[in-house]
């Protein structure tokens, strides 16, 4: 993109365009413009300003044909008019006029059959760096013939001062115009808006092409056996998919087409609060030159204090995936052999591992369950159930059943085994029982991956009708059936019913969708 290309677009008097700059140029600009500081680890650390996380209430889709008939409108996918979009796009172009701009071209999707060409335009060097880290970097040849399928304009300091007149949530805006293949971001610096914005678009495009898009991590073994790990925040997805005996395909966003599984991204975006080099050596080793730290506290001597959460709990690092030693270079793999749903059940009633039928897999996928521990006024802590459809509802423009149906079809077609793994509590709920030990969970995962779990006999967990193995190598058989781990068996039965009711209540939202009653595969009271 040349300066006169911007002129035609309505972005006037651009001082200079940095078109796909290399890491060294970005590093120099970040320091020169005082956007960040160099740390003793070699990575630059930046602050994302007042927004240290996403702004989901400020995300909108332009409501217009033909996309309006596909989008699941509601609190997550909020509608906005074409007129308001046009007005804010004009403001965005005015705002970017007269500035030095960075244009970053990249791909979302490692599969040649499914990838999309993405362009990001921003005035901020570290945001360009973030895009270079997180998406798939084109070759020189690909850049020569690059034609974007979608362009995202970031105006981080632009506020919409007419938001009340427009009937919007705040002066921040993240708006997707599917028909024009454009998105605009205004008023927030947070890098995750760019990452998850493109993820939302992949979650729109791919299912309409009959391909499944997924919020999961993926790895591959020596026998080319692929495993997918789904789970909400705090369930152990990152930790459990980092396996010394397997190569990482990706840590967060994947597609599944007729050729197999592929990463959407070319990088990782890892949480670093409390990062311990002994517990997570891969992530720690990846934090070096070209990695980009967000919202960490840096001491005067340039050392990073990973324990300090004074800016936010959501401290992060982005880095190109080749910073991880054991990654699969083409970011792809064959159809998965195993799918693992991770739930941190703080009620302490789900088994450490259970095998799911296809119908149960669709049910638990649509439920997207975990339980968080929340503090109450009197200092009593009790679990709070969290349900997020498909383990990533915030990023799904289409109705969750669209993704569940595709998952069911693919499980059937490729004979995939699906398991539910509880990384939460055993022996009682939070406060009475204890957290499932990491070695026990790893042993369950290993038994799934090496196939030995299929040799076990199974018993049935009542109400939930889950198949529980009676033997898993490396796991104390006494903990495999959760009821056995509770001293008060009646209290366990009551808690199991309580959780079943929460599942049933959550699932009422799906009544009357499609021609299949998914609820039959869930708990029955």
Swiss-Prot record:
Q: Which cofactor does it need?
A: Mn(2+)
Locate the residues binding Mn(2+): 196, 215, 252
Q: Name one GO biological process term.
A: gluconeogenesis
Query: Which leading EC class covers this enzyme?
Result: lyase
Show the GO cellular component annotation of the record: cytosol
Location of the protein in the cell: Cytoplasm
Question: Which key words tag this protein in UniProt?
Answer: ATP-binding, Cytoplasm, Decarboxylase, Gluconeogenesis, Lyase, Manganese, Metal-binding, Nucleotide-binding
Q: Quick one: which residues bind ATP?
A: 196, 215, 231-239, 280, 316, 441
Cite the PANTHER family for this sequence.
PHOSPHOENOLPYRUVATE CARBOXYKINASE (ATP), PHOSPHOENOLPYRUVATE CARBOXYKINASE ATP
Task: Tell me the function of this protein.
Answer: Involved in the gluconeogenesis. Catalyzes the conversion of oxaloacetate (OAA) to phosphoenolpyruvate (PEP) through direct phosphoryl transfer between the nucleoside triphosphate and OAA.
Q: What is this protein called?
A: Phosphoenolpyruvate carboxykinase (ATP)
Q: Which organism is it from?
A: Nitratiruptor sp. (strain SB155-2)
Report which gene this protein is encoded by.
pckA
